[in-house]
């Protein structure tokens, strides 16, 4: 059964103590803040927005693309109305200004963490961990940031299934950028699955739906040789085994219905 679509101002509940993400309280009643999907649980009610831009928040993990190199900063496009600043002091070793283009140049992609966002929306970036995760291979697929929880799933259930069924490496940025790498036919299959998740994010039973889709598409691939459109090159990117922290999983679970 599909979930109920609500618009801003729709009454969600008359129990103000259950107000969750995407809602506001007025006169002890809960109303929808977004145009989105009603998400009802025993202890919380919320709304998953159907669309929206990425607004950076501290500790978000994102995929950034270099757009400007200055003597002390790399200015990053983070798929947001607000650019991010990755200061040279955040790099693992000391480098001179003249070396900055050699480390990261315009157009390069890298996995970063949002270090801080001030009241004026100045976004400071840092390395996700002690490693320097420049994305030298693979490709980046972009989905609406509000659909990211559906790509990851409860406790990473969806992304784990995608990795297993496509044999691809995947990293999902909270800004809607998804890095994928693998063999040509596997990458093509995964890209199709990601587009289907984005298009059907409001549907219930999505994980099972995507699993069946992948099985059917894999059968079609075996029947006819797929056209090659992607070259991954040599594997140069080594990501941590666990792509997302437990804190991120908890945030995701707040937004998703446990039956999906």
UniProtKB/Swiss-Prot annotation:
Coiled coil: none annotated. Residues 136-194 form the KH domain. Residues 59-128 form the S1 motif domain. Pfam families: ECR1_N_2, KH_6, S1. InterPro entries: Exosome_RNA_bind1/RRP40/RRP4 (IPR026699), KH_dom (IPR004087), KH_dom_type_1 (IPR004088), KH_dom_type_1_sf (IPR036612), NA-bd_OB-fold (IPR012340), Rrp4 (IPR023474), RRP4_N (IPR054371), RRP4_S1 (IPR048565). One of its GO terms (biological process) is exonucleolytic trimming to generate mature 3'-end of 5.8S rRNA from tricistronic rRNA transcript (SSU-rRNA, 5.8S rRNA, LSU-rRNA). It comes from the Archaea. GO terms for cellular component: cytoplasm; exosome (RNase complex). Its main location: cytoplasm. The keyword Cytoplasm applies. It is found in: Cytoplasm. Disulfide bonds: none annotated. Keywords: Cytoplasm, Exosome, RNA-binding. GO terms for molecular function: poly(A) binding. HAMAP family: Exosome_Rrp4 (MF_00623). Belongs to the RRP4 family. Component of the archaeal exosome complex. Forms a trimer of Rrp4 and/or Csl4 subunits. The trimer associates with a hexameric ring-like arrangement composed of 3 Rrp41-Rrp42 heterodimers. Non-catalytic component of the exosome, which is a complex involved in RNA degradation. Increases the RNA binding and the efficiency of RNA degradation. Confers strong poly(A) specificity to the exosome. This is Exosome complex component Rrp4. It comes from Methanosarcina barkeri (strain Fusaro / DSM 804). The lineage of its organism: Archaea, Methanobacteriati, Methanobacteriota, Stenosarchaea group, Methanomicrobia.
